[in-house]
Amino acid sequence: MESIAKAKSLPNKGRTYDSQRPWNRDSPFSFAAWWSTPSTRYLKVDQPSGRDEHDSLDLEDEDVSNYLASHRERQKRRASCAAKAKVLIIGCAVISLFAIIGALGFALGRRATLPGSCASPAHQNPHTPPHPRPTKGEAHDAGHSGSHSSSSSTNNHHHSHDDSPPPPHVGIDKPKQCGESPDEAQSRGCIFEPQLTAWVAPECAFPAVVAEYQDAVGDMMTEWPWFWDTGLQKAVSPEEFPSLQAGNYSVVYTPYQASHALHCLYCWRKVSYALEHGVDWMDARCHQFYHQRHCAFFIADKLLEMEDWRAAAEVDVQGRLTTWTYPLLYHNCVPLSSTMES
């Protein structure tokens, strides 16, 4: 035991973990001990090793040998703990870095949907050309079976037509969800929408819009003049109206001039209904961007072509023209996916 006391009382020439520090490097909670290499836990490079002092001891003394062995074992355990701590801290740092990068990416992605981030013309990419405005009198796309005939176009349009075909539908070669016959469409649960003259898959058919539109503009299948031929010689008889109402026909024609504009307005109503109710699906016709642009400028052209704007003006009960007020307003942006009223 005297030898152990002698070993403990040796000068601290190379021992930097004992009373020379305000903290104890032998403690497992000492960061100084964690982040130093095993060789510096009891040695100092610029000083003689503390082990030199042990050379003067009687190494045959069993107590001194046991003390030194246990001391080295403690140093090995501390080195192992320090290595594990390094791995743990580095792993936490890497995970935190990836979490920060992910959060920044999510925030940048969400920024486009926030009210203050709507893309105004000033913020658009100057290298991206805007959608071209369809020319006046742009012909309705051939996919709409209720399009007006060429004779009615000539009588009501005072400008040239651009007969360039519309862009094809995306996925036009895919199988039709509603089949290719009225019976097949009914068997698949599809719904007939008169203003589209089409059977529509149930996911994007809105019976409520069909009903409200019919209340507003009437039953087009019974109130408009219909014909079986383009020459308007073979009229659809009243007895055949139920077949039109049920969507059980191939093709019909009408000279009713408001049909085109009413069809466009119906599509807009479907889009607004879908936004209002959070519906994720829209029929291919009303979803078509070309069709939306065409409808907007077609209706605008028809309004501007009116020879007497007073003929379409609203009057009050005293016969005075209604005056529309246009104050200067400042609108915010709202997410297009919002179902809340703005």
UniProtKB/Swiss-Prot annotation:
Tagged with keyword Coiled coil: no
Gene Ontology CC entries for this record: membrane
Topology in membrane: Single-pass membrane protein
InterPro entries with a match to the protein in the record: Phomopsin_biosynth_assoc (IPR053008)
Compositional bias per record (Low complexity), positions renumbered to this chain: 144-155
Segments traversing the membrane: 87-107
Keyword tags: Glycoprotein, Membrane, Transmembrane, Transmembrane helix, Virulence
Localization: Membrane
Entry superkingdom: Eukaryota
Region (Disordered): 1-22, 118-186
Keyword RNA-binding: no
Annotated glycan sites: 248
Cited PANTHER family: IG-LIKE DOMAIN-CONTAINING PROTEIN, MAJOR FACILITATOR SUPERFAMILY TRANSPORTER
Role, per record: Part of the gene cluster that mediates the biosynthesis of the phomopsins, a group of hexapeptide mycotoxins which infects lupins and causes lupinosis disease in livestock. The role of phomB' within the phomopsins biosynthesis pathway has still to be determined. The pathway starts with the processing of the precursor phomA by several endopeptidases including kexin proteases as well as the cluster-specific S41 family peptidase phomP1 and the oligopeptidase phomG to produce 10 identical copies of the hexapeptide Tyr-Val-Ile-Pro-Ile-Asp.
Name used for this protein in its record: Phomopsin biosynthesis cluster protein B'
Classification of source organism: Eukaryota, Fungi, Dikarya, Ascomycota, Pezizomycotina
